[in-house]
């Protein structure tokens, strides 16, 4: 279960980790009041459970309380990567000298707990691992022994911190381990952790993920279980679809988890970016196809819809009728690329071609076409 940034920072603060002064606002007026208490320049951060919110306009600045109210009104009126903004964290603007990356996580592939340390703060961990492996330090933690002070010394040296800040690093890393242990967290991340202009270490951003299986031990969070679903994921769950939201622009609808994952891999292979995982299941009815297609057609991020169906117990003619009805009911005119193969394929193909859709028999051809359309629409 993902915690909101303000919740993660509250835990960090209670464990002695320095965080910026701030407060939560549910309205623009509350944002102004919080900004007045802080005084001076502030940063307003949309509390959403998606990544890269800064790039999506979810982090804005204000020079005074009146401007903070205006900026908050703007934030509350928008969606950040598909999520409606209902809470804003208003914080003092920190004068940053240097940014770092610091996390404590469970490396499941190697079955170990590790600190990940990098001088490249603000960079996603996936990008660090892939592009800058020499800028990433791994410090293994034996769960029997736990955190030891030498770990913070290794981290401080790697980051090039002045020696007067080594005690701060020790306190932060020790607290991170205690948070993981006490909250059953599988991720405690500060990105960035910064050295301020006044030579202090502060966690400017914080992320904590709690193991779902331990929620019975954390009543304060258990009540909110499931809230990490995006709006689209919540709708899909109510409709009974297997759906996961991603960051791409090619909507994907298939029957069967294996075919869906294979289609996503093909999209990535040909240079596209999947917007989602959506498995309509075997034997899907016209109504089920219609609701799934409507979900993706109405998704703001989806530029083109790719449908890949292998008809066994799923009948291609039912799929075709569902797609046609979805377009008619939503009135959304987005490119749709369709691959049909199997039961009642000829009927389904005829229905779709009568409506002007091109239907492919080979998945490769359909995927290439969808990627081409998405790229052209991005130019």
Swiss-Prot record:
Mg(2+) binds at residues 191, 205. Residues 9-235 form the ATP-grasp domain. ATP binds at residues 45, 91, 94, 99. Pathway: Carbohydrate metabolism; tricarboxylic acid cycle; succinate from succinyl-CoA (ligase route): step 1/1. Binds 1 Mg(2+) ion per subunit. Keywords: ATP-binding, Ligase, Magnesium, Metal-binding, Nucleotide-binding, Tricarboxylic acid cycle. Substrate binds at residues 255, 312-314. It is an enzyme of class 6 (ligase). Its cofactor is Mg(2+). GO terms for cellular component: succinate-CoA ligase complex. Disulfide bonds: none annotated. It catalyses: succinate + ATP + CoA = succinyl-CoA + ADP + phosphate; GTP + succinate + CoA = succinyl-CoA + GDP + phosphate. Transmembrane segments: none annotated. GO terms for molecular function: ATP binding; magnesium ion binding; succinate-CoA ligase (ADP-forming) activity; succinate-CoA ligase (GDP-forming) activity. One of its GO terms (biological process) is tricarboxylic acid cycle. Its EC number is 6.2.1.5. The keyword Glycoprotein does not apply. PANTHER family: SUCCINATE--COA LIGASE [GDP-FORMING] SUBUNIT BETA, MITOCHONDRIAL, SUCCINYL-COA SYNTHETASE BETA CHAIN. Succinyl-CoA synthetase functions in the citric acid cycle (TCA), coupling the hydrolysis of succinyl-CoA to the synthesis of either ATP or GTP and thus represents the only step of substrate-level phosphorylation in the TCA. The beta subunit provides nucleotide specificity of the enzyme and binds the substrate succinate, while the binding sites for coenzyme A and phosphate are found in the alpha subunit. Heterotetramer of two alpha and two beta subunits. Belongs to the succinate/malate CoA ligase beta subunit family. This is Succinate--CoA ligase [ADP-forming] subunit beta. The gene is sucC.
């Amino acid at each position: 279960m993902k915690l909101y940034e303000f919740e993660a920072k509250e835990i960090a603060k209670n464990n002695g980790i320095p965080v910026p002064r701030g407060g939560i606002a549910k309205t623009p007026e509350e944002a102004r009041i919080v900004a007045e208490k802080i005084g001076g320049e502030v940063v307003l951060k949309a509390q959403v459970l998606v990544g890269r919110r800064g790039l999506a306009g979810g982090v804005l600045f204000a020079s005074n309380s009146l401007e903070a109210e205006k900026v908050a009104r703007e934030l509350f009126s928008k969606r950040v990567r598909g999520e409606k903004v209902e809470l804003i964290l208003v914080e003092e603007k920190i004068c940053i000298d240097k940014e770092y990356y610091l996390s404590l996580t469970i490396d499941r592939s190697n079955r170990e707990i590790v600190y990940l340390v990098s001088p490249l703060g603000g960079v996603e961990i996936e990008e660090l691992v892939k592009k800058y492996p020499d800028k990433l330090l791994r410090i293994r933690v034996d769960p029997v022994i736990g955190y030891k002070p030498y770990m913070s010394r290794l981290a401080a040296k790697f980051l090039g911190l002045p020696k007067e800040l080594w005690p701060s690093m020790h306190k932060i890393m020790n607290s991170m381990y205690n948070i993981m242990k006490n909250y059953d967290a599988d991720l405690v991340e500060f990105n960035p952790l910064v050295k301020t202009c006044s030579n202090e270490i502060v966690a400017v951003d914080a992320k904590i993920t709690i193991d779902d299986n331990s929620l019975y031990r954390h009543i304060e969070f258990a009540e909110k279980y499931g809230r990490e679903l995006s709006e689209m994921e919540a709708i899909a769950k109510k409709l009974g679809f297997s759906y996961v939201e991603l960051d791409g622009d090619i909507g994907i609808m298939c029957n069967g988890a294996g075919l869906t994952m294979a289609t996503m891999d093909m999209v990535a292979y040909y240079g596209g970016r999947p917007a989602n995982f959506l498995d309509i299941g075997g034997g899907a009815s016209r109504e089920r196809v219609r609701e799934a297609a409507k979900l993706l057609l109405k998704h703001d991020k989806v530029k083109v819809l790719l449908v890949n169906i292998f008809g066994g117990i799923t009948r291609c003619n039912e799929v075709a009728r569902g797609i046609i009805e979805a377009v008619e009911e939503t009135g959304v005119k987005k490119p749709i690329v369709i691959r049909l193969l199997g039961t009642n394929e000829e009927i389904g193909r005829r229905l779709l071609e009568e409506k002007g859709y091109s239907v492919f028999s080979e998945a490769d051809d359909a995927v290439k076409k969808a990627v081409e359309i998405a790229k052209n629409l991005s130019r």
